[in-house]
Amino acid sequence: MNIRPLHDRVIVERQESESKSAGGIVLTGSAAEKSTRGIILAVGNGRILENGSVQPLDVKVGDSVIFAEGNIKAEKIDGKEVLIMSEYNILAIVE
């Protein structure tokens, strides 16, 4: 995949969520929630500050992250669905 996000945006591949409930029931359709975890595939150069300097991002390619769903753009690139979001949408890095 050859894509470079701009500024503070990142490209994330969503990880599949568990399709079974805690009780072992298989969830289908709307009952199965979309995962809010993913792997960072690409990062922009950073956020441009008011003074013109660039603040590097805290995340890097390969990081496993938890993100908020709001203000995310889903795109198909090379046949794979990826998410384009601002670093602001990332809530945590899973270590």
Curated annotation (Swiss-Prot):
Subcellular location, record wording: Cytoplasm
Pfam families tied to this protein: Cpn10
Keywords tagged on the record: Chaperone, Cytoplasm
InterPro entries, A to Z: Chaperonin_GroES (IPR020818), Chaperonin_GroES_sf (IPR037124), Chaprnonin_Cpn10_CS (IPR018369), GroES-like_sf (IPR011032)
Recorded GO CC terms: cytoplasm
Superkingdom as given in the UniProt entry: Bacteria
Any one GO biological process: chaperone cofactor-dependent protein refolding
GO MF annotations in UniProt: ATP binding; metal ion binding; protein folding chaperone; protein-folding chaperone binding; unfolded protein binding
Homology family: Belongs to the GroES chaperonin family.
PANTHER family: 10 KDA HEAT SHOCK PROTEIN (PTHR10772), CO-CHAPERONIN GROES (PTHR10772:SF58)
Subunit structure: Heptamer of 7 subunits arranged in a ring. Interacts with the chaperonin GroEL.
Function: Together with the chaperonin GroEL, plays an essential role in assisting protein folding. The GroEL-GroES system forms a nano-cage that allows encapsulation of the non-native substrate proteins and provides a physical environment optimized to promote and accelerate protein folding. GroES binds to the apical surface of the GroEL ring, thereby capping the opening of the GroEL channel.
Name this polypeptide is given: Co-chaperonin GroES
Species, as recorded: Aliivibrio salmonicida (strain LFI1238)
Lineage start: Bacteria, Pseudomonadati, Pseudomonadota, Gammaproteobacteria, Vibrionales
Name of the gene encoding the protein in the UniProt record: groES
